[in-house]
Swiss-Prot record:
UniProt protein name: Large ribosomal subunit protein uL6
GO CC terms, sorted: cytosolic large ribosomal subunit
Family: Belongs to the universal ribosomal protein uL6 family.
PANTHER family: 60S/50S RIBOSOMAL PROTEIN L6/L9, LARGE RIBOSOMAL SUBUNIT PROTEIN UL6M
Assembly and binders: Part of the 50S ribosomal subunit.
GO annotation, biological process: cytoplasmic translation
Keywords: Ribonucleoprotein, Ribosomal protein, RNA-binding, rRNA-binding
Amino acid sequence: MSRIGRKPIQIPDNVNVTVENRQIIVKGPKGQLSYSLPEGIGITIDNKTMLITRESDLSKQRALHGLARSLISNMVTGVSQGFTKALQIYGVGYRAQVSGNKIILNIGYSHPVEFVLPEGIKATVDEKQTTITLHGIDKQLVGQIAANLRAIRPPDAYKGKGIRYTDEVLKLKPGKTGKK
């Protein structure tokens, strides 16, 4: 049996979980998320504890068992606490600004790059305009938006200029060695 799928999910007091026709709806103080259960995967809720079960031991169902448990656990965490992802901008003159639901990036191109944030994602920029912090309740969406922002100007291998995650460690390449 999947070891991840076997773990019970604890439901906080401020989160409400309902199941209707294989559709799980999780409501909390930060918002609401829903997930459609795959075929062969079941759910039992009792006394602020959720347990995910599967009908058979087929390899596809074993894989979906752990996946469903992780996704539902992330939904519960998202609506109660939320998720954040921070990006750091490195480079002389590189900076970011937030205006409404747009992030305006000056990152070495001849024009400022405008990145439109989807609904449910908020962004903040620090005073130095070099750290972008994304906030949201959907872990997958927060991570995808962070990856899309990083892809606009990935870190350079020689100088390290560009957009990277705050916890990302770059191994810089050595430059050319001159003739003597």
